[in-house]
């Protein structure tokens, strides 16, 4: 079991939970990093959540450079739209999975967070998402049909159920090798957690 770390975030040891997406949505479409990386982070997130945006823009670049690009960590994105407070979060998650069907999840992910302020309060953001999809490099007709038909709605719901089974009640929450890290913690907090896990699993110095 992972030793709980007293850091500037909530770190809870919990039981292992199956979080891999099942069925036609392959995990590879929304994972980054080597499949055999010793550590997997499941990022349970909401595209309309400002704290999730802060993590994506401020913390994730450092983690990508130091852990993902070096083969130590794999990151898997799990949708947890908080629809009661973020009215466009669910359709944004559906749009991201429509892009994932064309292997363009991460470009769409980045655009959704970068332009969050522009679409968050739109009464019907579908057309805006289609423009983001164009920028992400998707086939526009396929993307629009996917989004308008609700083709990915069940996958988003399944994601949310997985996240709740893992113990996530807010966003962002990160399930890391049996523990939960809650909130948009700074890179230093993630380093403390990841370095400890890496040493315990491999016996090697992380950096």
Residue ranges and their predicted role:
Residues 23-39, 67:
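A short beta-strand-turn-helix
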Residues 41, 108, 143:
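Divalent metal-coordination and catalytic microenvironments
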Residues 19-21, 161:
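N-proximal helix/coil linker or "cap" segments that precede and/or mark the start of modular domains
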Residues 31-32, 119, 181:
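Short clusters of hydrophobic/aromatic residues that line enzyme substrate/ligand-binding pockets
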Residues 4-18:
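Bacterial N-terminal signal peptides
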Residues 37, 45-134, 166-169, 196-200, ...:
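Structural alpha/beta surface segment adjacent to cysteine/selenocysteine redox centers
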Residues 44-46, 57-60, 130-207:
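C-terminal cap of thioredoxin/glutaredoxin-like
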């Amino acid at each position: 079991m992972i030793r709980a770390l007293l850091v500037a975030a909530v770190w809870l040891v919990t039981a292992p939970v199956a979080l891999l997406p099942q069925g036609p949505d392959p995990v590879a479409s929304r994972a980054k990093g080597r499949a055999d990386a010793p550590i997997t982070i499941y990022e349970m997130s909401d595209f309309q959540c400002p704290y999730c945006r802060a993590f994506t823009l401020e913390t994730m670049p450092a983690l990508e450079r130091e852990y993902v690009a070096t083969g130590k960590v794999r990151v898997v994105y799990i949708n947890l739209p908080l629809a009661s407070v973020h009215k466009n979060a669910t359709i944004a998650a559906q749009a991201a999975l429509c892009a994932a069907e064309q292997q363009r999840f991460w470009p769409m992910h980045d655009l959704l967070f970068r332009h969050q302020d522009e679409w968050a309060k739109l009464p019907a953001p579908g057309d805006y998402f289609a423009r983001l999809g164009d920028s992400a490099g998707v086939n526009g007709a396929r993307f629009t049909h996917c989004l308008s038909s609700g083709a990915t709605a069940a996958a988003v719901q399944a994601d949310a159920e997985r996240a709740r089974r893992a113990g996530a009640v807010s966003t962002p929450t990160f399930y890391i090798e049996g523990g939960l890290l809650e909130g948009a913690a700074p890179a230093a907090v993630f380093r403390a957690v990841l370095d400890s896990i890496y040493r315990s699993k491999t016996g090697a110095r992380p950096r």
